[in-house]
Amino acid sequence: MRGQFPRTAEQLQTLPGIGRSTAAAIASFCFGERVAILDGNVKRVLTRVLAFSADLAQSANERELWSRATDLLPEQNLPETMPRYTQGLMDLGATICTGRQPQCLLCPVQALCRGLATGEPGKYPVKTRKLKRSAQALSLLWAQRPDGSVWLEKRSSPGIWGASIACPSLKVTMN
């Protein structure tokens, strides 16, 4: 970047730890760039307003929501409107259009909200839960010959680290 701070969301994403939504927020607030953000609060607001019922756990559906979020962005006077629009969406999701008990009667966009019109705004966004992972304890055996070679074996295909080469292991019962 030749000593210059990035000025676009695309450039900001090249910095370590800056993802798409954070980069968009910075670009919107600081430079008035017309770019959508999609943090958790904004996802909740947009899926409810649009009655977007596609499962956001599927990347194609998340891409579609990004596209719709972009379509809804202001188009004029961007240096002033983009920071206000972005902050407004974030605040709406954090304070009124909350996850557990949305306060629809206080919402400034209730007349536009298709989720409210369904009578079930709380069912949005749709995101299937990931499977809960169980904890396993393993003891690894380290066996080394005098010449420095180590005993390794190919793990069975199903299961954790399937078909990988590893030290022999034993499952340990957890109490």
Protein language model regions, located:
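Intrinsically disordered, low-complexity, charged terminal extensions of DNA damage-control enzymes
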Residues: 91-175
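Catalytic cores of DNA base-excision repair glycosylases
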Residues: 1-105, 109-122
